[in-house]
Curated annotation (Swiss-Prot):
Similarity comment: Belongs to the peptidase S1 family. Snake venom subfamily.
Activity regulation annotation text: Inhibited competitively by amidines and guanidines, and irreversibly inhibited by diisopropylfluorophosphate.
Active site: H43, D88, S177
Domain named Peptidase S1: residues: 1-222
Descriptive protein name: Thrombin-like enzyme gyroxin analog
InterPro entries: Peptidase_S1_PA (IPR009003), Peptidase_S1_PA_chymotrypsin (IPR043504), Peptidase_S1A (IPR001314), Trypsin_dom (IPR001254)
Record's subcellular location: Secreted
Length: 228
């Protein structure tokens, strides 16, 4: 996250860290939505992944930190009008909720335009050069209406959200992918894509719109993985 500050240790209990299981490289963020399921971005996928829950500083382990790996992964492939950007990961075994681990509930309503939203992650804090922090950074950004989004990115599909600061300087960045966009306390977006370098004026970040995928997410969790 560019232009943010170290997150409060208690504000990101649902934020998970995805690591490449072979190289041990930090890849992406993700969001815990219940004891067995994590949502992230599809391009974060690797054949082997470790998922760390309850982490703050990458180099200092909490007593209640837990590690899981994907038991099964599901990608959205149901409707050509939707972006194929998100990934549901079923964990190999349920997570124990604790002081530093609790889920973020799915949204009950779509986000209202002009919401102030919170983003967070262990992604780049400078762009360029690439500086990765040991602790997650958090920032507040604004949700933009779809016209602003299309103005910045004319070929943008519809099932997305754009958020940022029009004058630039605050934005999600590389390796924040997969983490949450939280608007008015609700989990509304998944970090997907943005300009390179990050945090440019008039170039908001792009997020998968969680509300538009609720039926699919809930059916996958319920065990129905076919498209209705």
């Amino acid at each position: 996250v560019i232009g943010g500050d170290e997150c409060n240790i208690n504000e990101h209990r649902f934020l998970v860290a995805l690591y490449d299981g072979l190289s041990g490289t930090f890849l992406c963020g993700g969001t815990l939505i219940n004891q067995e399921w994590v949502l992230t971005a599809q391009h974060c996928n690797r054949s082997l992944m470790n998922i760390y829950l309850g982490m703050h500083n990458k180099n200092v382990k909490f007593d209640d930190e837990q590690r899981r790996y994907p038991k099964k992964k599901y990608f959205f492939r149901c409707n050509k009008n939707f972006t194929k950007w998100d990934e549901d990961i079923r964990l190999n075994r349920p997570v124990r909720f604790s002081a530093h681990i609790e889920p973020l509930s799915l949204p009950s309503n779509p986000p209202s335009e002009d919401s102030v939203c919170r983003v967070m992650g262990w992604g780049q804090i400078t762009s360029p050069p690439e500086t990765l922090p040991d602790v997650p950074h958090c920032a507040n950004i604004n949700l933009f209406n779809y016209t602003v989004c299309r103005g910045a990115y004319p070929r943008m599909p519809t099932k997305v959200l754009c958020a940022g600061v029009l004058e630039g300087g605050i934005d999600t960045c590389n390796r924040d992918s997969g983490g949450p966009l939280i608007c008015n306390g609700q989990f509304q977006g998944i970090v997907f894509w943005g300009p390179d370098p990050c945090a440019q004026p008039d170039k908001p970040g792009v997020y998968t719109k969680v509300f538009d995928y609720l039926d699919w997410i809930q059916s996958v969790i319920a065990g129905n993985t076919t498209c209705s």
